[in-house]
Amino acid sequence: MTAVCTCELARRSDVEAISNMSRWLIEAGLTPMWVPERVLWHMRDRESTVLVARDQTRLVGFAIMQFMDSSAHLNLLGVMPSRQRSGIGRQLLRWLETSAVTAGTFLVKLEVRESNHAARRFYASVGYTETGVVEGYYQGRDNAVRMSRNLSVLKASGG
């Protein structure tokens, strides 16, 4: 199934929805860290990009990436369960990866819950490699699997 949605930079009016989606989709069972103030901080940060995916006017996905000197870090990527496996996550990730390459950054890193096998399969399917495990990464409760992708291939292929 192909995503029929628009990806765009998040607006101030999206902050609450992004924070809520993070709490439901990513931070379930944890003390919420991605409160509206933190999302807004990343929206204002010149080294971060906050994207949303909309199905007409409804927010169906979001992603937050922070760019550093030699790499980028995918902080969050979430898609509403009813729209998962429809290409929205790939669409958001493609936008961010293209932005990274355009900015001269060719390495993207992320962490995902060790128990989140669906997310691990998704990231592997788009070229991410597992590079290690961080015990207790999620507030001492859950381990994280570190993953990364070298984007040099995107530069070489032109996208």
Predicted regions and their residues:
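Acetyl-CoA-dependent GNAT
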Residues: 5, 9-84, 90-99, 103, ...
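Conserved catalytic-core motifs of GNAT/GCN5-like acyltransferases
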Residues: 109-111, 124, 129-146
